[in-house]
Amino acid sequence: RNIVEYLVNRKDCRVTAADIREGSNWSGIAADLGKSRYFKPVLDDFTEKSAFEKLDRQFDEIYMLAAIVGVNRTLREPAEVIRVNTQLTMNVLDWVAKNPVRRILFSSSSENYAATTDLFDADVPTSESIPLCIGEVKHPRWTYAITKMHGELAFIHSAKGLNYEPTIVRYQNIIGPEMGFGHAIPHIVERFAKENGSP
């Protein structure tokens, strides 16, 4: 949402926002005559390769933010997290192999070193050079982390052959408008409220 709005507001590039459902600010951007010519929304399921046929063939940059995220969904649907997140990564790379770009930013997660900090007492804040690991493989929590580790490796090690500059961002519990309560920060707030007798 914020990246789309930021880039459209610059008015020096055209932005294609591709997702399985409409972003909360897309209709407002599309209705604004001063912004709409810089913006193209594409709604489809990008775990299906056929969805990529709706995209233009020339882009300078890709911001790969699409994924199943959130504690609740990861615990409830671990197999779907693996399927969707892995398929999205591979489909983007297959598309880039035929439609070159200059840069790809992959949205990863600090969850990638959560087990390292837990099991090996690593420092917090944690160095990005620390080895990554997961905890107990039977716990669904780690399905999300493993898809993000896979994504990092896939985008980093495909970069030379596909001639793009990769950037990996390991977010730590970001939150913003309209994200709902299925994420870490709302969970912490809810737990605090319950422990202190607040509604």
Each model region followed by its residue ranges:
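N-terminal Rossmann-like NAD(P)+-binding domain of SDR-like oxidoreductases, especially those catalyzing
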Residues: 1-174
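Glycine/proline-rich active-site loop of Rossmann-fold NAD(P)-dependent oxidoreductases
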Residues: 149, 162-167, 174-187, 194-199
